[in-house]
């Protein structure tokens, strides 16, 4: 079974920053408030919420001045495949949801989930315990989520994760979203006809290819803007925008301010 490296995090981010994930996993918000954005949608988490997210890039901001404390539980594909196979008979009792899985799912932590998390944290503090105990606690947590009120949506997301064409598309798009290709070129390079490519894309991401590419580029530009000294015109070109004015319009629509204002806010908050 895959090794799982669970990490306790502390974030202080009053403005949106980009967080990239190469694998799927769970966040448990132990303290504070935090907002996640994906494809223009905002997901607000309060203390005691749990978040399941698929691999990808997200904009994140803490809602309080105090640090947000989170527990990150990665869920590698091999671990999830073993989990689904091991408990397949039991999970088959849960109804299926055939809609496109959402990139993010928020769970309220019930008393039984809270107890499961406490047990997991207790094991993490013991270096003398074998790693299999951690894996068993995570399996327990996944089963509780599967049998929660959002269990059908959660299982639908898990079942899609093992789909090889979908995994290949995710890898392909992360490697090529900055390419200045037409959509037909993306489809051809991926090895599909345009119609089939669009259908697969909708199944994986739930939005159109153009909308996803635009969102991914604006997040990349946002990261360059806040973490470097490149000029705004150079950032626009680097992120694949046809002009600085188009980039500024897109950025304002996405974040509610211009790139220049965002950079000034970053300077003011960090000193």
UniProtKB/Swiss-Prot annotation:
GO terms for biological process: regulation of DNA-templated transcription. InterPro entries: AraC_XylS_family_regulators, ExsA-like_N, Homeodomain-like_sf, HTH-like, HTH_AraC, HTH_AraC-typ_CS, Tscrpt_reg_AraC-type_HTH. Pfam families: ExsA_N, HTH_18. GO terms for molecular function: DNA-binding transcription factor activity; sequence-specific DNA binding. The keyword Transcription regulation applies. Keywords: Activator, DNA-binding, Plasmid, Transcription, Transcription regulation, Virulence. Transcriptional activator of the thermally regulated virulent yopE gene. LcrF activity could be modulated by the interaction with an inducer molecule serving as a temperature messenger. The availability of the messenger would in turn be controlled by a temperature-responsive process serving as a cellular thermometer. This is Thermoregulatory protein LcrF. It comes from Yersinia pestis.
């Amino acid at each position: 079974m895959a090794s799982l490296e669970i990490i306790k995090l502390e974030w202080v981010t009053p403005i949106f920053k980009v967080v990239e994930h190469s694998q799927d996993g769970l966040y448990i918000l132990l303290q504070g408030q935090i907002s996640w954005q994906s494809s223009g949608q905002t997901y607000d988490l309060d203390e005691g919420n749990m978040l399941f997210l698929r691999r990808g890039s997200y904009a994140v901001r803490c809602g309080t001045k105090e640090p947000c404390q989170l527990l990150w539980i990665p869920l590698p594909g091999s671990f999830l495949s073993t989990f689904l196979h091991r408990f397949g008979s039991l999970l088959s009792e849960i109804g299926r949801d055939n809609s496109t899985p959402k990139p993010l799912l928020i769970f309220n932590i019930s008393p039984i989930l809270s107890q499961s998390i406490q047990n997991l944290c207790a094991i993490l503090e013991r270096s003398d315990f074998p790693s299999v105990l951690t894996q068993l606690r995570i399996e327990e947590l996944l089963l509780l989520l599967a049998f929660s009120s959002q269990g059908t949506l959660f299982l639908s997301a898990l079942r899609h994760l093992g789909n090889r064409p979908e995994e290949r598309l995710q890898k392909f798009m992360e490697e090529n979203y900055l390419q200045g290709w037409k959509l037909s070129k993306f489809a051809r390079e991926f090895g599909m006809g345009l119609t089939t490519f669009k259908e697969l894309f909708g199944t994986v991401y739930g939005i159109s290819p153009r909308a996803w590419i635009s969102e991914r580029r604006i997040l990349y530009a946002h990261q360059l803007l806040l973490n470097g000294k490149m000029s705004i015109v150079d950032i626009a070109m680097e992120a694949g925008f046809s002009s600085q004015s188009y980039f500024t319009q897109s950025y304002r629509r996405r974040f509610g301010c211009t790139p220049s204002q965002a950079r000034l806010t970053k300077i003011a908050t960090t000193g």
